[in-house]
Amino acid sequence: MDNLDIFENACKYFLEKMTEFKEILSSKVNSLNNQDWILSKGSTKTCKADETGKKKRCKVGLNYGLKIELSVADVDIILNEFSSFFTKTYVENIERISNNEEIARYEFLARSSIGDEIRCTIYLANEWNIPQISLSGFVAPRYKKSDY
């Protein structure tokens, strides 16, 4: 595994894991097979300089998105795959956020001990939602390779 304390390595790792998970979903959920997901590579934000003058960076807006109608059965498959896949990665703390499930909005979160996150959000079709699935990532602040 790469040294994930380095910003560039962590960004590459999380994008690779999100891509790998998207491919798994495409093979497990029929309606996601052969779909063209939209990728956003996000943007880098720079934190305030520390006492040595070095600045940590974080990555926000890593995202795969797809407007597609899914079923509750699909959501169950996705949750199982999400839990199974991400517990074997650096973001092993898995949480299901069930506050909005009564309005057909499902959210699963994988988080690391230092604040990295990968989130899967699913909106099922109804009067409040545009049906879609989104995988988004956040890389917590780290120093660039050149700062070591």
Region locations from a protein language model:
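N-terminal leader/targeting segments
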Residues: 1-55
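Mitochondrial intermembrane space
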Residues: 11, 29, 38, 58-59, ...
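Hydrophobic beta-strand residues in large extracellular and virion-surface proteins
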Residues: 21, 25, 108, 120-122, ...
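Ser/Thr-rich, low-complexity intrinsically disordered terminal regions
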Residues: 34-49, 94-118
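Long, charged/polar, surface-exposed segments that mediate recognition or autoinhibition
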Residues: 53-105
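Broad gene-expression machinery/nucleic-acid interaction feature
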Residues: 61, 117, 132
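Non-cytosolic coordination micro-motifs
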Residues: 112-114, 123-148
